[in-house]
């Protein structure tokens, strides 16, 4: 089972790398695939390619994406997810609480690792999140046990 999992992740990694190269080659001069110009599908696909890459691409694109949230060219929840993913990778607190941790076999919101937790719900609302952190936590209730 472990051998099959390793083989699967190797293939996924190769596909991710090819997708990242293709995205960078196709990147328009304005620096992102705007929804209004390229459509929701292209914008979402580009986001997912970057989201499933590494900190190097997250650092490159977060400053490009952030101002596009206000104009509606980029989804605020998606931006928050990438922002938090980079923060966790760099050992910094999350701003929106999107990255969960495994505690006692359950996926839970990492409350101790949230920047200014008293104002996290306000930040989430301002960014366009559709759930509170409690509602987000509830989404993980039926997940299989983690380790």
Identify the role of each PLM range.
Residues 138-143, 147:
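Low-complexity, Gly/Ser/Thr/Pro-rich intrinsically disordered linker/tail segments
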Residues 1-93, 97:
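N-terminal helix-rich structural modules
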């Amino acid at each position: 089972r472990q051998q099959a999992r390793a083989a699967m992740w190797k293939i996924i990694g190769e596909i991710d790398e090819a997708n990242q190269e293709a995205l960078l080659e196709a990147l328009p001069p304005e620096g992102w695939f705007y929804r209004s110009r390229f459509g929701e599908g292209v914008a979402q696909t580009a986001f997912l390619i970057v989201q499933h890459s590494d900190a190097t691409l997250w650092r490159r694109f977060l400053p490009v994406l952030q101002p596009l949230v206000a104009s509606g060219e980029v989804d605020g929840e998606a931006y928050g997810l990438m922002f938090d993913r980079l923060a966790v990778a760099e050992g910094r607190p999350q701003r929106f609480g999107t990255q969960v941790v495994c505690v006692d076999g359950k996926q839970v919101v990492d409350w101790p690792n949230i920047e200014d937790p008293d104002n996290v719900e306000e930040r989430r609302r301002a960014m366009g999140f559709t759930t509170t952190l409690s509602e987000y936590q509830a989404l993980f209730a039926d997940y299989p046990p983690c380790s």
